Amino acid sequence: AVLAAMIAKADVFIQNLAPGAMARAGFGSVALRAKHPRLITVDISGYGEEGDYATMKAYDLLVQAETGLAWVTGRAEGPGRVGVSCCDIACGMNAHAAVLEALIARFITGQGKGIAVSLFDGMADWMTVPLLQFEGTGRNPPRIGLAHPSICPYGAFGTRDGQLVLISIQNEREWTSFSAHFMDEPGLPQREGFRSNNERVANRAMVDAHIAAMFASLTRDACATKLRRANTAYGFVNDCEGLRTHPALRRIAVGTPQGPVEINAPAARLSDGPRALGPVPALGAHTRAVRAEFAG
């Protein structure tokens, strides 16, 4: 009764139970929209609500595997897992965007609509480029860790002080500058095996080894100085401590029942200043108020 009363006043109803579970409980999206025409319903699933996969369990890593993401991630020795729950996150982002679109449409038409989002569809969309590459060439994109399958040099190199620096050379002008100002070898682009990107890709092991020797002779800070002088795109391969102390990281304090904690700030920056985030409620903190509001 409480849920039905809440839905009657709601703009959006989102559920991610097993396909058909809400309908069996009397809260199927089609029936809800028939009863409440302005309601926007969102059904989140692993693989959609029809077909052989509809009843499959769909944890994030399983979907990484099923969509081919795990296959193109990692090193040559075998597939790898993306280190964050990207399928879950992508699904939520797709649902959020679709809800905003539906709210705008309802403002115009006065009608709600049904939205269905699956973890599989969200990650399959992200896999468009590898899939098109396979369909165009008949070959799966190779797994090469932090390198790039069609660009060289492009990858992470170890420094004298045990750090990793990632570089990306996008064109021959950048390669010429990198050779002169970082490698201190202005004639390197004229050497056999180093002359063009195609040559460098074909001789990747030789090129990478030659570049790695220079990185290994320098500290991370010295590498950064020379890379900036060469105007080469680079980044540090940070661990979590590196992220925690990163100068670009924005953090905010949020209240919890155990006291304030710092978390990473939401990505979007608003022109009228940072948004105010309320405290995280304790489990059941609002149960009595919600029941009182919708009980009768």
Q: Which residue stretches match the model-derived regions?
A:
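Active-site-adjacent "lid/gating" segments in soluble enzymes
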Residues: 23-169
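Short Gly/Pro-enriched turn/cap motifs at secondary-structure boundaries
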Residues: 144-149, 155-156, 202, 258-261, ...
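Aromatic-enriched alpha-helical interface/lid elements that frame and gate functional surfaces
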Residues: 153-230, 234
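Flexible, small-/acidic-enriched active-site or ligand-binding loops
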Residues: 254-296
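Catalytic-loop motifs flanking and including active-site residues across diverse enzymes
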Residues: 91-95, 174, 287
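A structured beta-alpha segment of the ubiquitous adenosine-cofactor-binding alpha/beta core
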Residues: 1-34, 216
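Conserved PLP cofactor-binding pocket of PLP-dependent enzymes
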Residues: 228-252
